[in-house]
């Protein structure tokens, strides 16, 4: 049981490291889909990677990265909503 927890922790830390060094979430999720068998562990990894990836867009500090991300994924303009980057959903208020 301890070995399974250690492997899970190492997988999670590895995926977080990959997602924080410039890889897009879709690339890291693809690695999870390819190498982790279906089940609770896979679902937990995917949810954890998604949460970490949503915090990596630099909102509201780096607004241009949010736009770049949305243009890359959905070909829409990106807008910072607090710490979240939302594609094609403009703010109803001005941040700066």
Curated annotation (Swiss-Prot):
Tissues expressing this chain: Expressed by the venom gland.
Signal peptide annotation: 1-21
MF terms in GO: potassium channel regulator activity; toxin activity
Pfam families the record matches: Scorpion_toxin_alpha-beta (PF14866)
Subcellular location: Secreted
Ranges of residues in domain BetaSPN-type CS-alpha/beta: 56-93
Principal subcellular localization: secreted
Keywords: Disulfide bond, Ion channel impairing toxin, Neurotoxin, Potassium channel impairing toxin, Secreted, Signal, Toxin
GO cellular component terms, A-Z: extracellular region
Annotated S-S bridges: 59-80, 66-85, 70-87
Domain of life: Eukaryota
Keyword Repeat in annotation: no
Propeptide part(s) removed at maturation, as residue ranges: 22-29
Function: Inhibits voltage-gated potassium channel.
Family stated for the protein in its record: Belongs to the long chain scorpion toxin family. Class 1 subfamily.
Protein name: Neurotoxin beta-KTx7
